[in-house]
C-alpha cells in the first residue's frame, strides 16, 4: 500500500510499503559494562538507528515487585531510553528473568492472584517511571528446571492479566499501551511443558524464540550453536535442534507467524576436541573451550573474539546442510554464525513470513568494527539490510517551527498556534501523554505531536489525512 510516511515534523516522503515491516529486536545486557577494554559496552555504544526494538536485560524481583539488579541500573536506564531522543520510532523494553534468575521467583509470584497483582502494579509503575515501552518475560522455563507443572497455565494467566492491566492503564492515562513480550524456549520438551501456545499468543505482542544454544559442550561432541536445518545424521530428538524445526513447531501449534521473532546469536559455542585431527560435526569433545579475553565465559566466544581466532590462523569450514560456519585450530573448535549465515537465515525468515529477528546480544557483535574488519555491528547490520530496514527513517523527534505553548509574557495573546494551521489546541494536551503522534478532534488533516510534555500541531499535505493505524499521513 502506498503511504506518505511522516519522517520529521513537517517533512513527508512517499514510501512504498508492501505489508508490515519486520522487527529487528536487540538485547542489551547490563553486565557488558564490566568487560575489559574494547569489550566494555554501555548504552552509549548502541547505534540508535540499528534496531527497531531494544530490550534491556535484566531486571530482578523482590517481594513480588520488579526491581533493579545492578548498582547503576537507573543511570543506565536513562541513557538506554534516551536513545529514543535520536530515533523517534525506537521502542525499548525491560526484560525480567534470564537463565541465572532461575524459576523459583516466578513460581512464587504467579502462585496467587494477590502476588500477580502486586507484581503487575509494580511493573506498570516501574516502566512508566523509567520510560520503557514494555516488559519482556524471560522465564527459563515454566514447568521445567524446578518449576511445577501448573506454572504452564499460570504463566498464561499472568500474561493475560498483565495485558489487560496494560490496556486499562493506557485508557486511564491516555497513553500508548505498554507492550508485553516473552523470550521462549527452543527445546521441544521445554515448549511442551511450559507454554499454552494458542492462549499465550493471544496476549503477547511478540514471541522471541531463543533459537540458539541448540548444541554445546554439555553434549560431548561438536555441534552448531544455531543451525538453520538438521544435520543428515541427526535422529530422534536431535532432529528437532534446528531453527527451521523450532520456529515451525511454534507456528504449527498455534502461534501466528507474524508474532514469532527468530533468535539470532552474535556468539558461538566452543569445545575442546578429544582428537585434534577429528574436526567435523559430531566429533568427540572433552569439555568447553577456553573463555575469551573480553566476554570471559568458558565455552562461549563473542563474534568479535571468533574473528580474532580466525585472524590467528584458525581453519574455517562451512556446514552446508545446516547453513552455518565453524572453525578450528589445534584442539579448539567453535560453531557460530557469520554474515553469510545471518543473511541466509534472514531470507528464510522472510520466505516463511515470520515477524522478524531477535538478536542476543548487541554487545557481542563487533560493535567497534576493529576485530572483524567488516564495519561496526556487522552481523546486526546484515539483518537490517536483509529485512529491508536499511532505508527506514531514523530521526530525532521533530522540532516544529512553532510549539503550542503559553506565549511569552508581553506578547499580548494567550497561547500560540502552529504556523501549519489546523484546529486550535492548548498547551495542556501533551502534558499527560507519552511522546508520539495523536489525532486532532474534528480535523482529520491535522495531528498533535507530543515531545516531552510539550504540544505541537502539524498538518498532513493536502489530500491526506492522519491515520492512527500507522501514525502516518495516508490517502483519505
UniProtKB/Swiss-Prot annotation:
Name the Pfam families on file: CBM_14, Glyco_hydro_18
Give the residue range of the signal peptide: 1-21
Indicate the segments forming the GH18 domain, all copies: 22-390
InterPro entries in UniProt: Chitin-bd_dom (IPR002557), Chitin-bd_dom_sf (IPR036508), Chitinase_II/V-like_cat (IPR011583), Chitinase_insertion_sf (IPR029070), Glyco_hydro18_cat (IPR001223), Glyco_hydro_18_chit_AS (IPR001579), Glycoside_hydrolase_SF (IPR017853), Glycosyl_Hydrlase_18 (IPR050314)
Q: Which residues bind chitin?
A: 70-71, 97-100, 141, 210-213, 360
Give the EC number(s) listed in the UniProt record.
3.2.1.14
Q: What is the effect of changing residue 45 to D?
A: Increased chitinase activity
Q: Does the keyword Signal apply?
A: yes
Record-given protein name: Acidic mammalian chitinase
- Write the gene name: CHIA
Amino acid at each position: 500500500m502506498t503511504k506518505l510516511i511522516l519522517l520529521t515534523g513537517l517533512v513527508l516522503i512517499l514510501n512504498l510499503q508492501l505489508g508490515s515491516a519486520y522487527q529487528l529486536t536487540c538485547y542489551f545486557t547490563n553486565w557488558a559494562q564490566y568487560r575489559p577494554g574494547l569489550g566494555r559496552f554501555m548504552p552509549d555504544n548502541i547505534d540508535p538507528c540499528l534496531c527497531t526494538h531494544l530490550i534491556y536485560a535484566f531486571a530482578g524481583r523482590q517481594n513480588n515487585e520488579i526491581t533493579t539488579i545492578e548498582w547503576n541500573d537507573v543511570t543506565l536506564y536513562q541513557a538506554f531510553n534516551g536513545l529514543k531522543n535520536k530515533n523517534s520510532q525506537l521502542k525499548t523494553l525491560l526484560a525480567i528473568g534470564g537463565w541465572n534468575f532461575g524459576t523459583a521467583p516466578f513460581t512464587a509470584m504467579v502462585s496467587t492472584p494477590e502476588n500477580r497483582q502486586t507484581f503487575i502494579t509494580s511493573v506498570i509503575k516501574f516502566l512508566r517511571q523509567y520510560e520503557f515501552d514494555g516488559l519482556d518475560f524471560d522465564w527459563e522455563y515454566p514447568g521445567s528446571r524446578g518449576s511445577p507443572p501448573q506454572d504452564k497455565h499460570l504463566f498464561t494467566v499472568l500474561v493475560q492479566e498483565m495485558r489487560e492491566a496494560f490496556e486499562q492503564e493506557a485508557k486511564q492515562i491516555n497513553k500508548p499501551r505498554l507492550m508485553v513480550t516473552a523470550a521462549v524456549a527452543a527445546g521441544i520438551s521445554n515448549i511442551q511443558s511450559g507454554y499454552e501456545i494458542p492462549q499465550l499468543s493471544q496476549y503477547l505482542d511478540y514471541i522471541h524464540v531463543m533459537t540458539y544454544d541448540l548444541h554445546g559442550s554439555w553434549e560431548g561432541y561438536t555441534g552448531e550453536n544455531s543451525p538453520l536445518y538438521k544435520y543428515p545424521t541427526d535422529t530422534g530428538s536431535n532432529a528437532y535442534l534446528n531453527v527451521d524445526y523450532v520456529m515451525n513447531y511454534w507456528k504449527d501449534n498455534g502461534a501466528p507467524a507474524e508474532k514469532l521473532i527468530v533468535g539470532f546469536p552474535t556468539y558461538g559455542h566452543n569445545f575442546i576436541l578429544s582428537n585434534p585431527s577429528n574436526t567435523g560435526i559430531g566429533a568427540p569433545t572433552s569439555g568447553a573451550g577456553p573463555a575469551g579475553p573480553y566476554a570471559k565465559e568458558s565455552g562461549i566466544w563473542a563474534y568479535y573474539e571468533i574473528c580474532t581466532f580466525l585472524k590467528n590462523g584458525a581453519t574455517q569450514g562451512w556446514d552446508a546442510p545446516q547453513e552455518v560456519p565453524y572453525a578450528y585450530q589445534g584442539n579448539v573448535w567453535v560453531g557460530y554464525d557469520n554474515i553469510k549465515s545471518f543473511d541466509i537465515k534472514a531470507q528464510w525468515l522472510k520466505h516463511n513470513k515470520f515477524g522478524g529477528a531477535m538478536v542476543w546480544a548487541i554487545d557481542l557483535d563487533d560493535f567497534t568494527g576493529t576485530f572483524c574488519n567488516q564495519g561496526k555491528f556487522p552481523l546486526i547490520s546484515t539483518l537490517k539490510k536483509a529485512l529491508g530496514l536499511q532505508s527506514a527513517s531514523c530521526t530525532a523527534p521533530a522540532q516544529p517551527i512553532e510549539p503550542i505553548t503559553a506565549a511569552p509574557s508581553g506578547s499580548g495573546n494567550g497561547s500560540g498556534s502552529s504556523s501549519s494551521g489546523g484546529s486550535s489546541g492548548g498547551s495542556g494536551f501533551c502534558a499527560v501523554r507519552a511522546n508520539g503522534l495523536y489525532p486532532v478532534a474534528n480535523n482529520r488533516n491535522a495531528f498533535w505531536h507530543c515531545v516531552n510534555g510539550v504540544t505541537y500541531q502539524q498538518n498532513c499535505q493536502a489530500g491526506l489525512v492522519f491515520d492512527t493505524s500507522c501514525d502516518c499521513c495516508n490517502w483519505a
